[in-house]
């Protein structure tokens, strides 16, 4: 009887707990929904105040753009509102998650839930008997790090730190729901369906940081390849450089080797050793074989390497080590693996730092290359130096004609092969200084050439064309104050802001700025420094051109609420910049 009464009491307690937990979750859900509805429906007054404080960054007129410090993005008030809403919703969700984890009485496990739920008399607490692990799959091999077999499953909100969840919430509020997509192989409807169903992930600071962390661990092989290429080009590995030149020559004369060699490497360098490790030969006695050297491919790629990386490759388990593993003592193997002075292994944290440093240097080098290319294209196409740009144009044109005529009569396989050999011979550390000294002229000859060049430049005549100029317009708008003859400055805009203007009919402020110093010329143009803003006194002309029927007084065009006058400025066309 006591057992039945205790079971009834526990059941009633569980029912009461589940009832209040459901009510608690409903209250939290209603608070979240109300907060989301408030954040998504701002009032009209807030929109008008935000637009009046920020304005618009680009005028619709093609001849004028205005810049302002607060011209882009949302206002400060809206930004603070979004931050507060994100912080509030994140706190509520974390509180809800913590409460649900406390209410739940049975924890879930990521591996073999059925074994955890079964009751066994032979089990002693958390220590399970062998019957629970007979049907468990073997997930780990010899190289896998040891760790706990069972890990409680937790939600993403519990695993992610509070600041990560808060940043994701804030980004989801500030960034539009559907960002412009890049080109995809799928159709547009498929992409939209994936976005709606959530298959395509949205922008997340947590995901971005996690991807960079994983990428920093995986970039080691790419930097190893970069080191190998540098060693080959600088002749630090002469055998590998000559072998690479021979392979490049074979590819030049038979491009099919470009497909055959990677397949050969995959089959005999990856698949076959993997099969041997998986299914070793069952032998009790092995004939002794003298090791004549390492693999040619490893010599080509890893010779001349630093101590850390070369030690890893040299002391890694080879083909014969796998075959003889059954006849070796376990103590000897473990002792060999613990010899850190031979393996040269670094800690995982140090590897990540090295990869991050290499990624930083790689991105810096990439930026320098991009800037150099843009600078070359800008100097070549902008015709700032007429002589240099003209020479490059005619040189390129003559090269196109010459190569087009000569290409059918040239064996390009020989040309590419000879060019590669000559280039690497030129880069040899011993041959490079001798070649430079052989082709280098004396100092007297160089000074004579510079003197002739100066005389030639002194005799040159530069015929500069007259720059292209035009006038841009902007309207100085005033708003009527309380007194009849009292007008207050409103803003500078490229729109007249008459009663039929779309912005005025929509009760919105026109795009513009509050100071003439913030007005910038159109792209590719610059203000004439010898010209100032000038008032256009010919009001009738530009009023008739626009078909307006409003009263004119002096240089102003009036309507019941606003008056405006036209200002003009001269601009000069610049050279078209390279994008």
From Swiss-Prot:
CC terms in the record's Gene Ontology section: cytosol; peroxisomal membrane
Spans traversing the lipid bilayer: 244-264, 393-413
Peroxisomal side: 265-392
Record's function text: Involved in the regulation of peroxisome number, size and distribution.
Encoding gene, per UniProt annotation: PEX28
Biological process annotations from GO: peroxisome organization
Region (Disordered) location: 40-70
Predominant location category: membrane
Keywords, comma-separated and alphabetical: Glycoprotein, Membrane, Peroxisome, Peroxisome biogenesis, Transmembrane, Transmembrane helix
Pfam families: Pex24p
Membrane topology: Multi-pass membrane protein
Protein name: Peroxisomal membrane protein PEX28
Family recorded in the similarity comment: Belongs to the PEX28-32 family. Peroxin-28 subfamily.
Keyword Cytoplasm on entry: no
